[in-house]
Each structure stands twice: as C-alpha cells, then as structure tokens.
A protein has these predicted regions:
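Short beta-strand-loop-alpha-helix junction that forms the active-site gateway
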Residues: 145-162
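Nuclease catalytic cores
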Residues: 1-139, 156, 166-175, 179, ...
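Pre-DFG segment of protein kinase catalytic domains
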Residues: 142
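A short beta-strand motif that forms part of the nucleic acid-binding face
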Residues: 145-149, 191-193, 204
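Short, electropositive alpha-helical surface patch
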Residues: 196-212
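A short local loop/turn or secondary-structure capping micro-motif enriched for an aromatic residue
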Residues: 121, 150-153, 207-208
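Glycine-rich, phosphate-binding/catalytic loops in enzymes
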Residues: 55, 159-161, 206
Length: 212
C-alpha cells in the first residue's frame, strides 16, 4: 500500500437465453445495488487470485457459487436465474475487455476494496475504493466500478452524465489520497456490463493539483 495509507479488510460484500415464463427482473433500486455488490466481490476475487488464472470461460465453473452469493445478498428466488446471468455477463465482459484486464492485472501498490479515512467539512469520513494502484508512469489510479443500467440513447451521453453525477464523490476519494501521498492521480468509472469507462485527471478538480 502507499506510504501512510492503511488498508482495511472489506466486508463480504454470455450466454443468456431468457425463458418466456421468467418474471421480469427488477433492475431498480435494491436489486441493482445487490447485484452490483456481487459483481464487485467477484472482481476482487479475480484480481486477488491473479488475472492469469482467469480466462473468461472459467466464470462458468462458478455458477453455483455466484448463485449463493446473490441469495446471500438478498436476491429473491424468482430473480435468481436472471441475476446469475447478469453477474456472469459482467465478469465475461470485463475479462474480454483490454481495459478491464488492465484494471485487474498486477500493479505497484495495487489493492481492491481499499479502506481509507479522512476529514471533510470537519467530519471524519471513511471510504472504500474499489480498485487502486500506481501505474508504470507513477500515476495513482482510483477506480470505481459501476453497475448502472443504460436504457436506450447514446452510451457516450450516458457515460458523460455518469461522470457528472459521480465527479464530486471521486474528487473526495482523491482528496483523501492526496493527503497521504504526492503524485498525479487519475480517476475512473468502469462499467463492466458496457465494457466502457470514463477517466479524468484529479488535477482537473480545483484544489487537487500535486506538487512537482
């Protein structure tokens, strides 16, 4: 881990043929959050196992385990088959995506679900960063996985809106990290289901420049 930053243990957080008699899956609210928790968990498992052990077809061997994780997360029985298909699809997509593989590969000071504490507006806050590491150019990356659904319209417009939505949250992560180390920081929102992302430099946000 980077100097002065202490990681904390995180809590346990594409082949789909829909059956005509299967109830529609509720992607709103809690269902999305619960599915996202399981996707995060499996991305951490893959990363910590080592990417070289995870060709995309290996995901099929863990169907039952993914199902158990979804049940534990609160996905109901009638939504389970669809939930399993969506989690597996997200993992397939990530493992087939060059950016996804780069995120999950080994890096300097790499960590998953990395806990940090800092202060904001006079309050102590605690955050968990989905994935962070230092790349070959000495840049610290702070990456947040997102399971947001994209329904119609331009994917690029959707990603631009998502960046605007989460920019302040990501800036908060960068502020805490900046208090621990002085190096360039880049921020990324990564969308496994879309094989797509948005990234930007933390120095684009006022007050987050680093000292050369």
């Amino acid at each position: 881990p980077p100097l002065g930053v202490e990681g904390v243990a995180a809590a346990d957080p594409n082949q789909w043929v829909p059956a005509s008699d299967r109830p529609p899956f509720d992607w709103a609210g809690e269902s999305v959050r619960r599915m996202g928790t399981v996707i995060h968990r499996w991305l951490r498992i893959i990363c910590e196992d080592g990417l070289e052990k995870w060709p995309s077809h290996r995901v099929d061997a863990f169907t039952e385990r993914i199902s158990r994780h979804l049940k534990s997360a609160g996905i109901s029985q009638d939504q389970l088959a669809e939930g399993v298909a969506q989690v597996k699809s997200a993992l397939y997509q990530t493992l087939e995506d060059p950016t996804g593989r780069w995120i999950l590969s080994g890096h300097t000071a790499g960590a998953c679900e990395y806990g940090l504490s800092g202060s904001a507006d006079g309050r102590i806050i605690h955050v968990v960063i989905d994935r962070t590491f230092i790349d070959d150019n000495g840049v610290r990356w702070i990456i947040d996985y997102k399971s947001s659904a994209h329904r119609g319209g331009s994917v690029e417009d959707f990603l631009d809106r998502e960046k605007e939505r989460y920019q302040e949250q990501m800036a908060g992560y960068a502020r805490i990290m900046r208090g621990m180390e002085n190096r360039p920081i880049r921020l990324m929102l990564y969308y496994p289901q879309l094989k797509n992302y948005r990234e930007w430099g933390a120095d684009e946000v006022s007050g987050l420049s680093y000292k050369v």
